[in-house]
């Protein structure tokens, strides 16, 4: 059936394939010849439909359910369905989906935070785990710093930036500290990053600890901010897989979760999706072929998002192979159009710029004075730390 032309009989068989796949996606149950005849309302006999089923089974498009005797589409059938039907939906999206898409962020300078919110809304609309890739946006600045004591000599430092990024590090304290002392240091550093007068008077020891923590975490931040070999990846909504019947099996759930949490896999799929101007589905065995791994028994659908005509990254959703592809493709297309409009306005209004990963860039270095060229974040000068 791979020829450029097909006979009338082959056309009928492929119609049966598409109809069987459509019915399976709607019901989630194996499709029998009688059920299909009632659904499509044709004058084909059940015996003829069973013969077509047998041919499609031999071609690898269907497999038989040994309990009911009905047929279940294979990954190959879902691929054929996606290629021929997924972009053809005339159905209106559910009102709940439209309402969520209308909540997408408007223009703002908090690019990363807005993209994260958009990802959450997309996940709610589709009830699927979502992820997205993002370049690095230039001239970001630290707007908040928080400290949390792990024990007497370790603290978690959290940096928040103007563009909505959050960085965390666990750092060793040069001297033992307590929660009250660390809180005073936190308030002092928050005043510093906000260019306000200090609200706390610190002892010399506390000031030394604070400046050491700040400079250490800023150097780490600048290093990560400027030296990166792949787009940033954000993921959310893994628990949504539990609502799907196929993922109630612990082994299937483990396969899906391990695939979604594999950063290398998701970055590669989003990179492929970013360079296509439409939704792209990767289904079951196709994922296995790309990564030379066992079949993860799931599907990933990606769509690029743009600033004007420039692709910035891609959003992706993950779910079982029997996804409602038509609804997802339509939702993703509307979603991407709204994101494009918002990002384009934001970039021009706030004069934003961004960088792609470039591991071979000779200007990238761990030397703080070179790193700082890409950001407005600065180290404290020596006189302020003495």
From Swiss-Prot:
Family (UniProt): Belongs to the HrcA family.
Single GO term (MF): DNA binding
A single GO BP: negative regulation of DNA-templated transcription
The keyword Transcription belongs to this UniProt entry's keyword annotation: yes
Protein name per the record: Heat-inducible transcription repressor HrcA
UniProt cross-references to Gene3D superfamilies, sorted A to Z: 3.30.450.40, Winged helix-like DNA-binding domain superfamily/Winged helix DNA-binding domain (1.10.10.10)
Keywords: Repressor, Stress response, Transcription, Transcription regulation
PANTHER family found in the cross-reference section: HEAT-INDUCIBLE TRANSCRIPTION REPRESSOR HRCA
Keyword Transcription regulation: yes
Record function comment: Negative regulator of class I heat shock genes (grpE-dnaK-dnaJ and groELS operons). Prevents heat-shock induction of these operons.
């Amino acid at each position: 059936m791979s020829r450029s032309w097909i006979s009338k009989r082959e056309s009928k068989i492929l119609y049966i394939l598409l109809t069987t796949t459509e019915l399976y996606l709607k019901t989630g149950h194996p499709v029998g010849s009688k059920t299909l005849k009632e659904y499509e309302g044709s004058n084909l006999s059940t015996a003829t439909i069973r013969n077509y089923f047998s041919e499609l089974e031999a071609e690898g498009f269907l497999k038989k359910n040994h309990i009911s005797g009905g047929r279940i589409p294979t990954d190959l059938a879902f691929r054929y369905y996606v290629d021929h039907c997924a972009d053809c939906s005339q159905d209106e999206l559910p009102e709940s989906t439209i309402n969520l898409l209308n909540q997408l962020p408007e223009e703002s300078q908090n690019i990363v935070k807005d993209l994260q919110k958009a990802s959450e809304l997309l996940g709610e609309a589709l009830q699927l785990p979502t992820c997205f890739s993002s370049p690095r946006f230039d001239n970001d600045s630290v707007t908040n710093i928080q400290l949390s004591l792990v024990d007497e000599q370790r603290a978690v430092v959290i940096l928040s930036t103007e563009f909505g990024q959050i960085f965390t590090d666990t750092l060793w304290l040069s001297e033992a500290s307590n929660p009250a002392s660390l809180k005073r240091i936190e308030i002092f550093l928050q005043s510093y990053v906000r260019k306000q007068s200090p609200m706390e008077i610190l002892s010399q020891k506390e000031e030394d600890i604070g400046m050491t923590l700040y400079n250490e975490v800023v150097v780490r931040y600048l290093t990560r901010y400027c030296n990166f070999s792949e787009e940033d990846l954000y993921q959310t909504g893994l628990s949504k897989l539990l609502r799907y019947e196929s993922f109630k099996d612990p082994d299937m759930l483990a396969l899906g979760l391990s695939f979604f949490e594999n950063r290398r896999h998701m970055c590669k799929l989003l990179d492929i999706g970013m360079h296509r101007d439409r939704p792209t589905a990767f289904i079951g065995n196709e994922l296995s072929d790309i990564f030379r791994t066992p079949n993860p028994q799931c599907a990933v659908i990606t769509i690029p998002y743009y600033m004007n005509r420039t692709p910035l990254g891609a959003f992706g959703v993950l779910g079982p192979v029997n996804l409602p592809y038509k609804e997802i493709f339509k939702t993703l297309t509307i979603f991407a159009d709204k994101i494009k409009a918002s990002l384009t306005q934001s970039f021009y209004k706030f004069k934003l710029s961004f960088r792609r990963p470039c591991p071979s860039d000779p200007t990238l270095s761990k030397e703080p004075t070179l790193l700082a060229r890409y950001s407005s974040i600065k180290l404290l000068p020596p006189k302020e730390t003495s």
